[in-house]
């Protein structure tokens, strides 16, 4: 089952406005993460970064999205030599459209936050989604799904 991927326009670490519906790649991976430079989010981003050439060989663009500022994203990208764009969603436009903002629990306390999730998009449709992701090996899991298709 596929569903139309919500379009959005967000500013990238390349200082360009990225509009989902105008991305030329055959496949697009959007991975949503809570915060730059935190242990789990850094692990996930570094894993996608280490596999970026394999995603590219399969005509797949990868974008990381969080509500961090563009300045925060740029520092994060530079620190870890990330080879793809991060998108700043401070107003939670894509975050809400993809329904990745919700109740979370940490150390017995409930709060609202970004739920780590990824989406694979083809022809403006979501063809696969991963919600409440465990970050270890997730990038490889996404790549394996693409290679198996």
Label for each model-derived stretch:
Residues 1-149:
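Chalcogenol-based redox active-site neighborhoods
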């Amino acid at each position: 089952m596929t569903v139309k991927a919500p379009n959005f326009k967000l500013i990238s670490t390349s200082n360009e406005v990225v509009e989902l519906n105008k991305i030329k790649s055959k496949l697009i991976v959007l991975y949503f993460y809570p915060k730059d430079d935190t242990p789990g989010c850094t692990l996930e981003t570094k894993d996608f970064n280490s596999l970026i050439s394999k995603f590219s060989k399969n005509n797949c663009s990868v974008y990381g999205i969080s509500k961090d500022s563009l300045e925060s994203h740029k520092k994060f990208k530079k620190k870890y030599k990330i080879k793809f764009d991060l998108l700043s969603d401070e107003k939670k436009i894509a975050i809400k459209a993809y329904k990745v903002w919700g109740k979370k629990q940490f150390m017995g306390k409930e709060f609202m936050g970004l739920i780590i999730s990824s989406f694979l998009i083809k022809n403006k449709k979501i063809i696969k989604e991963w919600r409440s992701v465990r970050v270890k090996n997730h990038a490889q899991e996404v790549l394996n799904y693409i290679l198996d298709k």
